[in-house]
Amino acid sequence: DGFQFNMSCGYNLEGIKDKKIDDFIEGMKDARDTEIFRECRTWLLEHVDLFEHVTREDIEAIPSEICNSITLSTMHGCPPQEIENIVMYLLREKHINTYVKCNPTLLGYEFVRKAMDDLGYDYMAFTDFHFKDDLQYEDAVPMLRRLKEVAAQEGLSFGVKLTNTFPVDIKRQELPGEEMYMSGKALFPLSITVAARLAESFDGELPMSF
């Protein structure tokens, strides 16, 4: 009651259609024919005497429908059309409730740079590259509207997950490489601002996951 499993998938349509991933999605939607579900159910039934508050009837009543929702994790730079194609596939072909993880770059370089500076994170180094390469806000809103309509037609739920991490430059050898991903406290004001803007654009009618 009130507990929801959620799958995560990415990063391109070709990969999601791969048999291994497809089997995983279908197995989570209904696990009754999967080896692991049968194995676990059999073990529980054979060891019901180990439980104080679980009966054989409780075990037999465990549903095989494990998960009916999925979140699309989009890499930075994922083309808008690829995002839309994947969600269309998940809604129409897989018939599963779908959420899209959005990037904080939707806010634009100038806003994010000023926000980081004003909040004491001026040491965060980044250029406008990802802001130009990622999905733009003016493209995101109409795309999300289309996907929301398709979900309604399919009798499914559609929304956004906020937000993905934010790529910043490695300047002090914090990690190997050239780029790392910002999360935690510094990301929160960006995520909540994306939420506020989308809520305004959709009159509060766009489901959001955090």
Each model region followed by its residue ranges:
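Glycine/Thr-rich beta-alpha phosphate-binding loop at enzyme active sites
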Residues: 108-206
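Structured alpha-helical segments in the cores of large, soluble enzyme domains
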Residues: 50-58, 83-91, 147-151, 191-199
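Active-site periphery "cap/insert" segments of enzyme catalytic domains
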Residues: 56-82, 92
